[in-house]
């Protein structure tokens, strides 16, 4: 029997653990010189006040290796095989750290989601179909699916991407002056998928991207802080796609800090080539 762990880069909330049948390893967040455990002792209100009103940019770091080792070892002692699905190794050191931590334990398998947030949720739903299979079998299934998952998001402002070091000064200045909306893609690494002028064009880009969506898997609608942009996007999206959407995902602080408030987007599985 397999027990599934994810890190909080999955944006699976503590109250959703039973829904997804997972255990959560919280990333660490340093905010105003205080360390928090993502999704555990940092409320959304405190986080967004710091981000919006105080213009404090949080720093994120790996889950506690000591706590992770203790929790995973306990599951192994109870007779479980353990599958850990991590945020993409291209944007966090979590995957490599956990691979090293459990490199000599054949009862533990660490899988790179190649994504984050909704992408991990999709992988968790898939993994839950195979809890009585071997770790080798499940890993192969997830790796194949992970390579097809893409997250597309539109930040309301470029300021947070700039402050987080993910956007150069020149690109930030030009984009801000021209009101350019970059559509950011997370598919293993973070890239600019497209550049459009204005919010309506950004929404049209996201909707058109769904033409390459594999409708056998869920779409995860995602946002930060304010639902308005996402609600408008969904209202413009064809019903065939709305019908396979799961619950709206208000991104956890560890991810939301890079996008800023009022970002929105879709996470989905692309069709096989």
State each model region's role.
Residues 3, 9-17, 22-23, 28-30, ...:
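Mixed-charge interfacial surface used for oligomerization/domain docking
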Residues 35-104:
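Class I S-adenosyl-L-methionine
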Residues 3-61:
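N-terminal glycine-rich anion-binding loop in soluble enzyme alpha/beta folds
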